[in-house]
Amino acid sequence: MTTGLPSQTQVIELLGGEFARAGYEIEDVVIDHRARPPRITVVADGDTTLDLDTIAVLSRSASSLLDSLDNIGDSYVLEVSSPGIDRPLTSEKHFRRARGRKVELTLADGSQLTGRIGALQSGSLDLVVRAGREWKVREIPLAEVEKAVVQVEFSPPNPAELELATTGRAAGTEVEA
């Protein structure tokens, strides 16, 4: 049985330009033909936070574009969402977008680090870590990062730690290579 739904590639091609004009890119499209009604899930991300108002605007645009297809067929449910906080950071753009966020890294040698994401440059990541009572920047090659997951924080970060992550410098700290 065919549902008349477009393919993943067709959805990306149809919606990609509209999402790009809004400052977002489509990270994934999942089409579930078994759901009743069938479900099209579009996961988008960008350099600015994907808030509920933006999701509503993107959803309306996506729905209009999808509804304009001749072969869309039966009804469907459209979901537009962000990747979510538990999505592993897998590309340089993910790390860039998460600057200032607390992250847990697993490195190629099996060691784990928890710190705050700082600047990215030339295939490496500045990670702000606690060193005793101070904060220091450790440069971590992205090639050595096996897994990186943003951590949920329920309290505001230490101001010195956050300043170091966002500006790359703070009083009383040093850069460690």
From Swiss-Prot:
- Give the family per the record: Belongs to the RimP family.
Instruction: Note the CDD domains from the entry.
Output: YlxS_C
Q: Tell me the InterPro entries matching this sequence.
A: Ribosome_maturation_RimP, RimP_C, RimP_C_sf, RimP_N, RimP_N_sf
What is this protein's function per UniProt?
A: Required for maturation of 30S ribosomal subunits.
Q: Which UniProt keywords apply?
A: Cytoplasm, Ribosome biogenesis
Gene name of the record: rimP
Please give the name of this protein: Ribosome maturation factor RimP
Q: Which GO terms describe its cellular component?
A: cytosol
Write down the Pfam families for this protein, in alphabetical order.
DUF150_C (PF17384), RimP_N (PF02576)
Query: What does the UniProt entry say about where the protein is found?
Result: Cytoplasm
Instruction: Name its species.
Output: Mycobacterium marinum (strain ATCC BAA-535 / M)
* Keyword Transferase included in the entry's annotation: no
Q: Which GO terms describe its biological process?
A: ribosomal small subunit assembly; translation
